[in-house]
Amino acid sequence: MILVIDVGNTNCTVGVYEKQKLLKHWRMTTDRHRTSDELGMTVLNFFSYANLTPSDIQGIIISSVVPPIMHAMETMCVRYFNIRPLIVGPGIKTGLNLKVDNPREIGSDRIVNAVAASEEYGTPVIVVDFGTATTFCYIDESGVYQGGAIAPGIMISTEALYNRAAKLPRVDIAESSQIIGKSTVSSMQAGIFYGFVGQCEGIIAEMKKQSNASPVVVATGGLARMITEKSSAVDILDPFLTLKGLELLYRRNKPTTEK
């Protein structure tokens, strides 16, 4: 079995694979002050609930966009699983040709998603990840990662509206059936929801235009389902795209299952 860990700005997603099949998955809050022991106890609780043991795990791979948590995360892997994890970063074999100004500055989550989408759905492909930031990545028909766009995420934008506009309340993010709100709350929810639907459709349309191609569009991330159910611009919703990419990268870099 392989343990895959995606450390995002808001949540960490943990998954267990066996023979390329996702058996279990969990989420926990990303807390850069959490110790290796706290991380270990959390993961072991997940395992206990699923009737798994640390000895079941033969390899670990981690993707992280939160550098401060990585020392604790790596220590946790060694202390509780007796495994030194494979870290997604410079030097790892991805199979992607990165045609960008500085390949080292591309977030590991974007690389992982690009690898998974290219393998699973073919190229050309656009990957949209609705996370803390909303990211758009374009991989051309030759499998070359051409770059993309990064926009503020839905949660960030909603909190900014509340924090910077004195008379506007904090609202829950929700799908709105009406673009014309009848109250402050419903107006904010309509603006947030339809604003991001429009942003998604607009950026995808412009990427298709500038690339002069007809890529398949794959969406992932915590809020992807809500947006994609309203938008016809997205072809495929894959909530486990990042975990798939991590498992694939593990196989490409560690074909054996030795500890």
UniProtKB/Swiss-Prot annotation:
UniProt binding sites for substrate: G107, S108, D109, R110, T184
SUPFAM superfamilies: Actin-like ATPase domain (SSF53067)
Cofactor: NH4(+); K(+)
Compartments reported by the entry: Cytoplasm
Residues involved in ATP binding: D6, V7, G8, N9, T10, N11, C12, T13, T132
Annotated signal sequence range: none
Active site: D109 (proton acceptor)
Any one GO molecular function term: ATP binding
Cofactor remark: A monovalent cation. Ammonium or potassium.
One GO biological process term: coenzyme A biosynthetic process
InterPro entries tied to this protein: ATPase_NBD, Type_III_PanK
Gene3D superfamilies: 3.30.420.40
Pathway note: Cofactor biosynthesis; coenzyme A biosynthesis; CoA from (R)-pantothenate: step 1/5
Top EC group: transferase
GO cellular component: cytoplasm
Binding site for K(+): D129
Catalytic activity: (R)-pantothenate + ATP = (R)-4'-phosphopantothenate + ADP + H(+)
Pfam families attached to this UniProt entry: Pan_kinase
EC number(s) stated in the UniProt entry for this protein: 2.7.1.33
Family of this protein: Belongs to the type III pantothenate kinase family.
Quaternary structure note: Homodimer.
Protein name per Swiss-Prot or TrEMBL: Type III pantothenate kinase
Annotated source species: Listeria monocytogenes serovar 1/2a (strain ATCC BAA-679 / EGD-e)
